[in-house]
Design a protein with these regions (language model features):
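Nucleotide-activated chemistry modules centered on ATP-dependent adenylation/adenylyltransferase
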Residues: 2-215
Length: 215
């Protein structure tokens, strides 16, 4: 059921999946009821081609990017953030502090300022859109629970039975070149990444490798 006047807030990471989700949402609900919410990151570690990709997707959809940024985002990278609080993460199962500071806190602040909720009531006039697919049911269940507890509903276009697009190249946009060497569009030097990612950083990004060693 389509709710008239509902705003669909796409958590637009700059990665391929969230871009495809954004296309599906705009095609189904319209650009006027869609918000592309992004967290701009330090240009030292968010590849310039990811920024190119975000702009091209925004231009194609006719929806400007709305930014919810951490203060100092343009000069502080993931290493700076963790050094400031003298920790990487609180426990083995917790989210890395860089994600919390660079994305989660600005996201929650933006929501509270623009679309405040009153849990346990769930707002019925907005929906938060994520690019999780049908193979990520554990992530979907977790996100549904977290956001519902905060008073928000969520939707997952990549799980819809009827899809209009599967690859962003179908609309003439190339996905970020980072996908040719990594399997994601996270920061170069992602603190959640494994050995393979860091071996590539060591080989191709000596400045980032050097800063990581000193952090």
């Amino acid at each position: 059921m389509v709710v008239v006047g509902m705003r669909h807030i796409v958590c637009f990471s700059g990665g391929h999946s969230s871009a495809v989700a954004a296309v599906e949402v705009v095609r189904k609900f319209g650009a006027e009821d869609t918000i592309l919410l992004n967290h701009d990151l330090c240009p030292r570690t968010e590849d310039a081609d990811i920024k190119r990709f975000k702009k091209q997707v925004s231009d194609y959809l006719g929806v400007p990017i709305t930014y919810a940024n951490m203060p100092g985002w343009d000069v502080k990278d993931q290493f700076d953030v963790c050094m400031e609080i003298k920790a990487f993460k609180a426990g083995a199962q917790s989210t890395a502090f860089c994600t919390n500071r660079l994305k989660t806190e600005p996201f929650h602040k933006w929501l509270s300022e623009h679309y405040p909720a009153n849990p346990p009531e769930v707002r019925d006039d907005i929906s938060l859109v994520y690019g999780f697919d049908a193979n990520e049911q554990h992530r979907i269940r977790r996100r549904v629970g977290i956001m519902a507890a905060m008073g928000y509903q969520t939707e997952y276009p990549l799980t819809w039975e009827v899809r209009t697009i599967h690859d962003i190249e179908e609309v003439g946009i190339e996905r970020p070149k980072t996908y040719s060497i990594f399997n994601h569009a996270n920061c170069t030097g992602c603190l959640k990444a494994g050995k393979q990612h860091w071996f590539v950083v060591y080989c191709l990004y000596p400045e980032i490798w050097g800063k990581a060693k000193l952090s």
